[in-house]
């Protein structure tokens, strides 16, 4: 098919050849006339080609300094994010320093790249006339000149006979266009013309527009697994997953470097009583202590010296029963147990009922957090030794061998952009490129206008004189000849085009004032006005009522350890009291107050060991007996069997201090004693061995902000990673596979199992107070009610090890073994293996809230707020008159940054910028694909301390070191054999009291004894604390519908809603009354000469006479004056009419009007054809062809967009979905509204035709955008303010089944201009969502899927904005 331009060219060629043929015939019969007048001025030509791009502007001034970066991680989190810290880490973040002064202006940046070509400029003004060019070459020979002036008239000849009819004259100049005549009668149908010669094949046409999208094909066979794609770009950090289950207990790591000495720790839990060490030298006499309870009868002692008789003591008064003692403090938390097997997922329980608001706790004083001390070797905890004075720190250990290469760390936060470097030198000019391909031949130009008539030719030579004619006789004037035969009818011409508007007539007389017309019908609703300026700041509203308490939050991270309390002052040491004689066993009474101490009696003789008697019944409480006289010491009897334990007796009176007895034999190791009171400070012990590396302490306080560093050099550019397209967000992965089992650690001693501590009861939630200044970090809250099971998170990092549980109760004492032969001194045994950890203790009671911390420093400026909703397009204004040129404006501020240009050439290395502040922790990103092997890393940091080396050779004896800190309890020695009793020595004098010796090494644990006799039934224990909240029960049956609540008070007036869409066009109004007569038009200009009249009658006969009179009285006439009536020359007018009709049709195609009969292809075509038009509704036909399926759209000429409205534009507000159990995204159109998706129809166009037009619109555009407004009542649309995440955001469905989401791949995420639906306030709010893309196939939006719906009080409605293509 011929293109439009080809058709037009052929037509013009045909017409030109036809005119040329006619002209040649005319020239054969008529001589060329004189030069005609100059033609009228032609119409304005089309706009010229676009001007070349302007030169680049000068670089703008440097921008203002940016705001300070966000604060770094707090001290408490630094340790969690950096496991490589050694020793003391940095402290908590210091206060933010003041904002620095703006930096000096940077050097001007490098020249920017050439910007994109601008829009074609307006045609420039006609330039001044150029200088006169050089003379041209001689022209072609001119045409024949005009005929010379007529010669003198010859003598009059004889009247000749009437001549034949002359040839018709040349057609006259076209006359001015006449006013439109009445429609002529329909002409007869012409004969079909002969078939034309087959034309040459036309030039290949341009590529047609792509056809409609075909129906979706059947799914193909499953393809082979493709090669793994390139590594995708790192996704945005996902939200932090829940803390995973505690990992298995890892193997013991190598000992670390010695940590710095920590501060004094808290008083540790009571340890197991250690085995009795060998007896130390006798201590100083202590102050008299309070008598202890009566012990069991001891073995008879050796005979003592006879003491003096003591004075009889007064019987003590029986004390009243004491009040019950206060409740003991909860025990320390036990160690975390090994990870149990993963339980099966329980069914989701119903939401728990809201607890009552508790009273606000008293503020506790916030203590400074002490760094953790170095971790000691794990063993049985011995009794607290006397604290030695801290010795000097030992020398640092040798540097360990470098550790194995660590895994690559996470990307650090982006540093602050350094100052721009100086501008580099201009590079050398590039080599001239090869010549480009020659351009395509242009289309043939339109036929130029007809040239002006040539200049008159030279006068021709005079003709020969003719022969003398014979004188004729004067004839009579002849009669008028008959009219000629009627010419053949011409072909019916094309209907002439509509003539141009005639010149205005002369002003008419002023008419009478007409009657007032009838009131017109109301016009159509105007488009919404542009958004007004923001109103003044409103008065601050009163404080709202306190909202209901929120649901319990997620369980917080464990709080930092509290500071250790001040160690209590050591009590004064009491004198050990002597045991009184046991009284008779009374019945077990209530515990009385301690009686006064009785006087001490002399030691009795050692009696023989009697058999164990049966336990007597508890007797009544007896009166204290009179102190008996001391008996003489008896001989030592054999040891009897242990008797059953009698009931505790009443405390006896305090005895007098006895004299020092003989030194007894060294007894067997006694049972573990109770924990002793802290002793006095001992002398510093010898320096201990270097301790293992301590755990990393928490971050220390941030140092003051350092001065700004000088700019460093720019680092080398790293290797470019593969450009992977980021895939769509994957679902959260299942927990990762269990890691390989670590190497088996050395077996520890079997530690005693600690008792389970009581459960702390959770305090009730307090009422929400007004938001205070940021306090210091509080303790972890009680666990909330069990929520619905969330999606499976990724496996979290192993949880921290639990606190070691308190030691269990001591085992029963074993039987005394048989005495074996004395063995040789054995070697020191190796350290026993570490015992298994005790079960985890329960959470303690929630401590009181701390006092509110001081107000933190002002926060960094928040991120830029979301863009406001674009205002509704205003009504197109009428085109204003052209204004006068304005005064030259002042230089404007630098404009916004342009679109990012292509990457510049590599600049010189810039200076290293100051280290940026640590950014806030981002949400954990989704797992990326495994990256390629990175380049070899730099040398790692010093590795951990290696395993203990083999013992070296014995070195020389060093000098005595300064006394070190108290060393750890040594390993337990083996149980020695009992020595033979030595002979009793004579009593020596009492020696001076020596200093207290250091504690001896702990003996190894004895064999487990046989179980002792069953003790008496203990007192009933105190009521235990409440247990942990059980798992939610099975869902109960649905309760009956509650009675409707009372109507709440009217809410405050909501914000003004968005302007509604423009109303439909109003009906056409009734015709108005006939207006008054117009003013008479001005005098028209003189028309062209009319066609020549018919030939005149023959002239009168000449005068008779004998002379020759060749007088000629006819007027001269010009050759271009018509001499024949127009009816005789119809063919020229047909050609003229045809040409004009064709020209009008071509103009119509080239400059569409945007009407239904003459639609444009897109709004861009209309804007290019009519740049003076304003935005509004026009008709377009993207698929071209027949105009019956043209569609009416809104053309925004300011942006060049074509916008199509949805039908309907509003989804009404109601509770669309009732199901509070299922919480998932529900598609509004597909599921809720019965499969009715959003439609974009235009009146008079079917859905299929509209789909075709939309498909062409997408092909013709390279950019599309659309807005959706979600009006909500108690429904989250995007950000959930309570949780701070986007998990409840709505999903949109695009045209090609792509889902547009709130987070994930940036190509499929929408943006939010206004987010009012972030919390549930029982009021109507709105969220405006916008999606812009350079893939028009994704729009328009067809459906929306909210998640947070289903409850009785949740309603929503949707406004679907127009889809705009560009």
Swiss-Prot record:
Forms the fibrils of tendon, ligaments and bones. In bones the fibrils are mineralized with calcium hydroxyapatite. The modification Pyrrolidone carboxylic acid is found at residue 23. Residues 1-22 form the signal peptide. The modification Allysine is found at residue 84. Residues 84-94, 538-547, 634-643, 775-784 have a biased composition (Gly residues). Residues 23-79, 1120-1366 form a propeptide. SMART domains: COLFI (SM00038). It holds the Pfam family Collagen. Type I collagen is a member of group I collagen (fibrillar forming collagen). The C-terminal propeptide, also known as COLFI domain, have crucial roles in tissue growth and repair by controlling both the intracellular assembly of procollagen molecules and the extracellular assembly of collagen fibrils. It binds a calcium ion which is essential for its function. This is Collagen alpha-2(I) chain. It comes from Canis lupus familiaris. The gene is COL1A2.
């Amino acid at each position: 098919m011929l293109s439009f331009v080809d058709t037009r060219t052929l037509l013009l060629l045909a017409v030109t050849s036809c005119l040329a043929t006619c002209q040649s015939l005319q020239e054969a019969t008529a001589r060329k006339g004189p030069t005609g007048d100059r033609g009228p001025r032609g119409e304005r030509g089309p706009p010229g080609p676009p001007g070349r791009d302007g030169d680049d502007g000068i670089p703008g001034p440097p921008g203002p300094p940016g705001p300070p970066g966000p604060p770094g991680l707090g001290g408490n989190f630094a340790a969690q994010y950096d496991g490589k810290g050694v020793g003391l880490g940095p402290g908590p973040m210091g206060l933010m320093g003041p904002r620095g002064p703006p930096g000096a202006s940077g050097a001007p940046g490098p020249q920017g790249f050439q910007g994109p070509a601008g829009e074609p400029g307006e045609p420039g003004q006609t330039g001044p006339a150029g200088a006169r060019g050089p003379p041209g070459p001689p022209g072609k020979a001119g045409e024949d000149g005009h005929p010379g002036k007529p010669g003198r008239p010859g003598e009059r000849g004889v009247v000749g006979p009437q001549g034949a009819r002359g040839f018709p004259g040349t057609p006259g100049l076209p006359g001015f266009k006449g006013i439109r005549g009445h429609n002529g009668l329909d002409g007869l149908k012409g004969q079909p013309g002969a078939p034309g010669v087959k034309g040459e094949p036309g030039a290949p046409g341009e590529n047609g527009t792509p056809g409609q999208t075909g129906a979706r094909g059947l799914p193909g066979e499953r393809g082979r697994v493709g090669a793994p794609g390139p590594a995708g770009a790192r996704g945005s950090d996902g939200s932090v997953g829940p803390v995973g289950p505690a990992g298995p207990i890892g193997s013991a790591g190598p000992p670390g470097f010695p940590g710095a000495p920590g501060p004094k720790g808290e008083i540790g839990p009571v340890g197991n009583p250690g085995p009795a060490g060998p007896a130390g030298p006798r201590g100083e006499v202590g102050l008299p202590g309070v008598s202890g309870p009566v012990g069991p009868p001891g073995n008879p002692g050796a005979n003592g010296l006879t003491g003096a008789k003591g004075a009889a003591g007064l019987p003590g008064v029986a004390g009243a029963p004491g009040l019950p003692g206060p409740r003991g403090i909860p025990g320390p938390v036990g160690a975390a147990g090994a990870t149990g097997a993963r339980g099966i997922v329980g069914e989701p329980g119903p939401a728990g009922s809201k607890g009552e608001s508790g009273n606000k706790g008293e503020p506790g004083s916030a203590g400074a957090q002490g760094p953790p001390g170095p971790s000691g070797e794990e063993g049985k905890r011995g009794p607290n030794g006397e604290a030695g004075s801290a010795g000097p720190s030992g020398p640092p250990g040798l540097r360990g061998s470098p550790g194995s290469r660590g895994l690559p760390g996470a990307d650090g936060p982006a540093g602050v952009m350094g100052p721009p470097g100086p501008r580099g030198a201009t590079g050398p000019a590039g080599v001239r490129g090869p010549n480009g391909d020659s351009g395509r031949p242009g289309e043939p130009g339109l036929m130029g206008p007809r040239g002006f008539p040539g200049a008159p030719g030279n006068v021709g030579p005079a003709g020969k004189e003719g022969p003398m004619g014979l004188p004729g006789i004067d004839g009579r004037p002849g009669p008028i000849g008959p009219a000629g035969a009627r010419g053949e009818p011409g072909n019916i011409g094309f209907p002439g085009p509509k003539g141009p508007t005639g010149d205005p007539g002369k002003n008419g007389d002023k008419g009478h004032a007409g009657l007032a017309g009838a009131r017109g019908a109301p016009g159509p609703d105007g488009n919404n006005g542009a958004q007004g300026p923001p109103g003044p700041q409103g008065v601050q509203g009163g404080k709202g009522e306190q909202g209901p308490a929120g649901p319990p939050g997620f369980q917080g991270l464990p709080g930092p350890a509290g500071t250790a309390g001040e160690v209590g002052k050591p009590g004064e040491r009491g004198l050990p009291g002597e045991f009184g004689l046991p009284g008779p066993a009374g019945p077990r009474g209530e515990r009385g107050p301690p009686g006064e101490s009785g006087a001490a009696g002399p030691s009795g003789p050692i009696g023989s060991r009697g058999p164990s008697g049966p336990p007597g019944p508890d007797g009544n409480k007896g009166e204290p007996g009179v102190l008996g006289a001391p008996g003489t010491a008896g001989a030592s009897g054999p040891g009897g069997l242990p008797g059953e334990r009698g009931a505790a007796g009443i405390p006896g009176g305090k005895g007098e201090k006895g004299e020092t007895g003989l030194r007894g034999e060294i007894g067997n190791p006694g049972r573990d004693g109770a924990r002793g009171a802290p002793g006095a400070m001992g002398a510093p012990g010898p320096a201990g061995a270097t301790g293992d590396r301590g755990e990393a302490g928490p971050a220390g306080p941030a140092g003051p902000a350092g001065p700004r560093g000088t700019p460093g050099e720019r680092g080398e550019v790293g290797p470019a990673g593969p450009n992977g397209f980021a895939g769509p967000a994957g679902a959260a992965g299942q927990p990762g596979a269990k890691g390989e089992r670590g190497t088996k650690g050395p077996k520890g001693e079997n530690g005693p199992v600690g008792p389970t501590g009581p459960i702390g009861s959770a305090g009730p939630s307090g009422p929400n107070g007004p938001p205070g200044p940021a306090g210091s970090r509080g303790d972890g809250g009680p666990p909330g009610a069990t929520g619905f099971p969330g999606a499976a998170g990724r496996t979290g990092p192993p949880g921290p090890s639990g606190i070691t549980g308190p030691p269990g109760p001591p085992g029963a004492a074993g039987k005394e073994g048989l005495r074996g032969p004395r063995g040789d001194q054995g070697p020191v045994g190796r350290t026993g293996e570490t015992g298994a950890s005790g079960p985890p203790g329960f959470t303690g009671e929630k401590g009181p809230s701390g006092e509110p911390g001081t107000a933190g420093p002002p926060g960094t400026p928040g991120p830029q707020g979301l863009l406001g909703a674009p205002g509704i397009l205003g009504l197109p204004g009428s085109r204003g008159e052209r204004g006068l040129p304005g005064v030259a404006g002042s230089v404007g501020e630098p404009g916004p940054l342009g679109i990012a240009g292509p990457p510049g050439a590599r600049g010189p290395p810039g200076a290293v910028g100051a280290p940026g502040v640590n950014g806030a922790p981002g949400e954990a990103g989704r797992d990326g694909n495994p990256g390629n092997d990175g380049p070899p890393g730099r040398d790692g940091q010093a590795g951990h301390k290696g395993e203990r080396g083999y013992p070296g050779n014995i070195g020389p004896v060093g000098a005595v070191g300064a006394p070190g800190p108290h060393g750890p309890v040594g390993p337990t020695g083996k149980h020695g054999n009992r020595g033979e009793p030595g002979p009793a020595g004579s009593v020596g004098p009492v020696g001076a009291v020596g200093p207290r010796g250091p504690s001896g090494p702990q003996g190894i644990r004895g064999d487990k004894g046989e179980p002792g006799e069953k003790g008496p039934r203990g007192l009933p224990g105190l009521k235990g604390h409440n247990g942990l909240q059980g798992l939610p029960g099975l869902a109960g049956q649905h309760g009956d519908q509650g009675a409707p609540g009372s109507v709440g008070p009217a809410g405050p007036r909501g914000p003004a809603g968005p302007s509604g869409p423009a109303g439909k066009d109003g009906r056409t109004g009734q015709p108005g009354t006939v207006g008054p007569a117009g003013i008479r038009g001005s005098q028209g200009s003189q028309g062209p000469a009319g066609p020549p009249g018919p030939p005149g009658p023959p002239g009168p006969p000449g005068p008779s006479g004998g002379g020759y009179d060749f007088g000629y009285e006819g007027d001269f006439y010009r050759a271009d004056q018509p001499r024949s009536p127009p009816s005789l020359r119809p063919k020229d007018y047909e050609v003229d009419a045809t040409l004009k009709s064709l020209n009008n049709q071509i103009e119509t195609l080239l400059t569409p009007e945007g009407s239904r009969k003459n639609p444009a292809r897109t709004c861009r075509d209309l804007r290019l054809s009519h740049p003076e038009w304003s935005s509004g509704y026009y008709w377009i036909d993207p698929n071209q062809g027949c105009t019956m399926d043209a569609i009416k759209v809104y053309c925004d000429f300011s942006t060049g967009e074509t916008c199509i409205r949805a039908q309907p534009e509003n989804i009404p507000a109601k509770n669309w979905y009732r199901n509070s159990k299922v919480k998932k995204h529900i598609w509004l159109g597909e599921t809720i509204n019965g499969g009715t998706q959003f439609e974009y129809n235009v009146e008079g166009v079917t859905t299929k035709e509209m789909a075709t037009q939309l498909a062409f619109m997408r092909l013709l555009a390279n950019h599309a955008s659309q807005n959706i407004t979600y009006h909500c009542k108690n429904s989250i649309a995007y950000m959930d303010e309570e949780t701070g995440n986007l998990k409840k955001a709505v999903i949109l469905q695009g045209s090609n089944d792509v889902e547009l989401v709130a987070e994930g791949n940036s190509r499929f995420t929408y943006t939010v201009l206004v987010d009012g639906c972030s919390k549930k306030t029982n009021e109507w709010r709105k969220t405006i969502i916008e999606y812009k893309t350079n893939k028009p196939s994704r729009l328009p939006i067809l459906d929306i899927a909210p998640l947070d719906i289903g409850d009785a009080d949740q309603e929503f409605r949707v406004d679907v904005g127009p889809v705009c293509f560009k």
